[in-house]
Amino acid sequence: MAFSRRWQAGVLCVTGALLALGDAAPAVQRAPASTGRLTALVGGTLLEGYAGPPIRNSVILIDGERISAVGQVGSLSVPSGAEVISTEGMTVLPGLWDMHVHTMIVGHADYDHWDKAYAPQFESVIMPAAARQLLMAGVTSARDLGGPLEASINVRDRINRGEMPGATLYVSGPFIQHEPYPNTEAYRWGVQGPADAHAKVRAIAAAGVDVVKLIDQDLMTIDEVRAVVDEAHRRGKPVVAHAHRPEEIRRGLSLGVDCFEHTGLATAPAYPDDIIDAIRERTAKMALGPLYWTPTIEGLLNYEYLRDNPEALDDPAWHEGLPEPIVADIRRSLEHPDRLPYFQLTAARRPTLARKFKQLREAGVTLLVGTDSGIPMNFHTQSTWRELDAWVSTLGVDPITAIRAATYWPSVAMKVDRDVGTVSPGKYADIIAVRGDVLRYIALLQRVDIVIKRGVRYRPDPSRH
C-alpha cells in the first residue's frame, strides 16, 4: 500500500475478508467532531498505552491536532477527503516520553569546557537542536531537568507556539541545591536558609516552570528542604529530587518529594533496608498517589558497549541542528571514552543496577522511563529506545509495562493525561509507528518510521512524498 495518499472516495470501509485478519472489532471510540485537517492511520497494530491487548488492523482518525476516533478496519470509516497513511505491518503507539533529559547538553564529555564555550548558544542553537532530535527519535514529550531559567522557558514556549519543531518540554529551570558548583550559577541556584529557599522556588514558579528540581538535599538543612518542597507544592509544582545518596532519599521521602531520579552514584550492592521500608510505607498510602522513580540506567548499562564499539557514536542523527564546529568538538571530547572521569566508577556501579531496580519495583514505586540524555556519549537521538531496551532485554520487564512507563505513566505524573499519554479520542495526536512487532523486538524503536505530534507529521518528511 502506498505510504500516503489523498482518499477521494466517500469512505474507506475494508471488507470482511480483511477484517478476518484481525481480532473482533472493539467498540469504536469517538470524540466530538471539529473542523481541522483530517488524517487517518490505517492497518497497524495499535498499543493504546493502556494495559489491554493490542488492537489489530487499527484505524485512528485525526482531526486537526487531536484524535477524533479509534477503531478497526471494517468498523470505523474514514471520512471523504482525509489523508490516509498506511501503517500496515507496523506497531502504532503513543509518542514516547523521556522523563529525564538535559537539552542544554548534547553528549560532550567536558562540562566545564562546554559551559564556557557554548552557554551563549544554549537558547538559540543547543536546546532547539536537542528538542528536535528527541522529536525525530519518537519522543514527543520530555521533562527537561536542569537548565538556565529564561532559556528553558523560552525554548519550551517557542515549541508550544509552533515556531520550531521539538518535543513538548516540561521544564524545571535551574537546579535548586545547597550551593552551586563553580561557574554553574546560571543554571544551579543555591539556597541559604528557609526564607531563601521559599524565595527561589517562588521565583522559578512565577517564571512558569512545570516542575522543581531538587538535588544535594542531604547537604541542606531539613528546614531548607521542607521550604523547597512546601513552596513548590503550594504553587502546584511537583518536586523531582536526586536519589544518588541514601540520605537524599531519606529526606526526600520524609518531606514529600514526588519523584526520585537515578539509582545512585555509590557502589553499594543494594538500597539500605530502612530506605526500602520507608518506600513501602509511602507507596502504601494510596491517598497520596503513586511514588514515581526515574532510574536512568541505560547510560551505565551501555557504557562498555559504546566504549568498545565507537562506531555506534558515528550515527549522524545526533548532528542534526548542530553547527559542524560543535559536532567536531563533541567528537574530540569522546576520542578516549575509557579515560573519561565521568565513567570511572561505572564498572563498579553497573552490577548494582539489577538489584536496585528490583528493589524499587518490589517496594511499589511507579517507574518512569528517563535517560539523562545529553550526558557524555548519551545522545538525545538514541537514549530513550536504549532505556526501553535495557528494561526489557536486561532487566526482564515485559514490553507493555516498559512502554507504559514511557507513555501513560509520565502523562499521569505530569498531570497532563487528559491530553496525552494514550492513543484515545479527544487527546492530542502524539503518535509514532515502527515497522515490525515492538512487543517482540523492543529495539525496533531505534528506527521510528512515523512521528506525528499534535496532528503534524514530522517523520517521514511529508514534503518528500
Model-derived segments and their meaning:
Residues A406-Y408, P425-H465:
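C-terminal cap of metal-dependent C-N hydrolases
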Residues T103-F122, H178-A195, G264-A270, D338-L345:
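Acidic/histidine-rich helix-loop elements
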Residues R30-T35, L46, G52-L93:
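Histidine-rich, glycine-flanked metal-binding segment
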Residues L214-R349, L368, I375, L395-G396, ...:
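Active-site core of metal-dependent hydrolases
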Residues G10-A20:
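Bacterial N-terminal signal peptides
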Residues R234, P337-Q344, R350-V434:
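His/Asp/Glu-enriched, well-ordered alpha-helical/loop segment
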Residues M90-R158, P182, D223, H244-H262:
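Metal-associated gating/positioning segment near the N- to mid-region
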Residues M127-E150, A167-P174, A207-Q217, P238, ...:
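Divalent metal-dependent hydrolysis catalytic cores, especially in the metallo-beta-lactamase
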